[in-house]
Structures are given as structure tokens and as C-alpha cells.
């Protein structure tokens, strides 16, 4: 029972970390990367579709992105969605593809992105702590019901705390790495 609860908590925490990594990948840094466009949604014949499912995204140079739509009739919709996004970029529509030159990030924009990264990191930490809280409630329920002894319950709680600390540490590392990436000129 205890092992199952701890294993389930660990799996959920790992999923929270994966989600945080995706969120951090979507934050724009000074360099171009395809993940920047993963959160852009385009209305594709009435259904909201993520940009990466509608086009191939290439990064031929550190500050250039080429987006080649699978359906050329959607090029204008993609251009508008990218322009309206919070990325702060202006795509050049070349008919069959979009060329995006990323401007050099200003110091102010870098600081703004660091705040966004810290906020996303805090959200990930809260998610990990919520998972811990739910697992602890389950452990307390098991002890109260008499399914496991109090000593075993305390040992499991300590394991859960260690697990939580480990995953919060991973989030801290992700934040530190993203800040360094953003401050790199």
C-alpha cells in the first residue's frame, strides 16, 4: 500500500517536471528553437491545432526560424497567429513558407522572460507540493485505518519528503539553467 502510494506520487511528480520542461522550452531566449512555437494554436478548419502539427519548423541559423506549412492555404493564418503571440517576432510571409528573424533581446525583455521563467518554476513547485499533500493524506488515511503501523507511516512520510525535495531541486535547476540561458548575450 505504502509503496504504491509513493510510486504513484513519484510518477505524478515526474509528469509535473516534464510539463515544466515543456513550459520552459516555450519561453523565448536569444536563440531560435522550434519549441518556442509549440504553444501557438491556429484555427484549422474550425478546430484549434498546435502549429507544430501543421508545419515543419526548422532552425537553419541561431536567430532564424523557417516554418514550412503542410497546407499552404494556412500560411496567412499561421503568420497572424505568430504575430499575435507573445513571442514578439514578426514573420515574413514568402508564400510557401514563413521566415522569422529573431531580434536581439533587450535587457528589459530578458528580465521579463526571467520573471516568466521563475513564475513557471513556482507553478511547477506548487504542483509537486500538491502531489505531496495528496500522497500524505493517503498515507495518513492508511495509518488511521490501521492498514499500516505508525512507524511505517512516518518512514513513508520521510521518503515522500525526500522525494518532494528531490523534485523541487530539479525545478530549481531548471530555473537556474533557463536564467543562465536568458542572460547569455
UniProtKB/Swiss-Prot annotation:
Family annotation (Gene3D superfamilies): 3.30.1360.40, Ribosome-recycling factor (1.10.132.20)
Q: Which UniProt keywords apply?
A: Cytoplasm, Protein biosynthesis
Q: What is this protein called?
A: Ribosome-recycling factor
Pfam families registered for this protein in UniProt: RRF
Record's GO cellular component, any one? cytoplasm
Family statement: Belongs to the RRF family.
Q: Where is the organism placed in the taxonomic lineage, from the top?
A: Bacteria, Bacillati, Actinomycetota, Actinomycetes, Micromonosporales
Keyword Nucleotide-binding carried by entry? no
Originating species: Salinispora arenicola (strain CNS-205)
**NCBIfam families on file:** frr
The protein's matches in InterPro entries, at most eight in alphabetical order, are given as:
Ribosome_recyc_fac, Ribosome_recyc_fac_dom, RRF_sf
Amino acid at each position: 500500500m505504502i509503496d504504491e502510494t509513493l510510486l504513484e506520487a513519484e510518477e505524478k511528480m515526474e509528469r509535473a517536471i516534464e510539463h515544466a520542461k515543456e513550459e520552459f522550452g516555450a519561453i523565448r531566449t536569444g536563440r531560435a528553437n522550434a519549441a518556442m512555437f509549440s504553444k501557438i494554436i491556429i484555427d484549422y478548419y474550425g478546430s484549434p491545432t498546435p502549429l507544430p502539427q501543421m508545419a515543419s519548423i526548422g532552425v537553419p541559423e541561431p536567430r532564424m526560424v523557417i516554418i514550412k506549412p503542410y497546407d499552404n492555404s494556412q500560411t496567412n493564418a499561421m503568420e497572424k497567429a505568430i504575430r499575435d503571440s507573445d513571442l514578439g517576432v514578426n514573420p515574413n510571409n514568402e508564400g510557401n513558407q514563413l521566415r522569422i528573424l529573431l531580434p536581439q533581446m533587450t535587457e528589459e525583455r530578458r528580465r521579463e522572460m526571467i520573471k516568466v521563467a521563475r513564475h513557471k518554476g513556482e507553478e511547477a513547485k506548487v504542483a509537486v507540493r500538491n502531489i505531496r499533500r495528496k500522497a500524505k493524506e493517503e498515507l495518513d488515511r492508511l495509518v488511521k485505518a490501521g492498514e499500516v503501523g505508525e512507524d511505517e507511516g512516518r518512514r513513508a512520510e520521510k521518503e515522500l519528503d525526500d522525494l518532494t525535495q528531490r523534485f523541487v531541486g530539479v525545478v530549481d535547476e531548471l530555473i537556474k539553467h533557463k536564467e543562465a540561458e536568458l542572460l547569455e548575450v
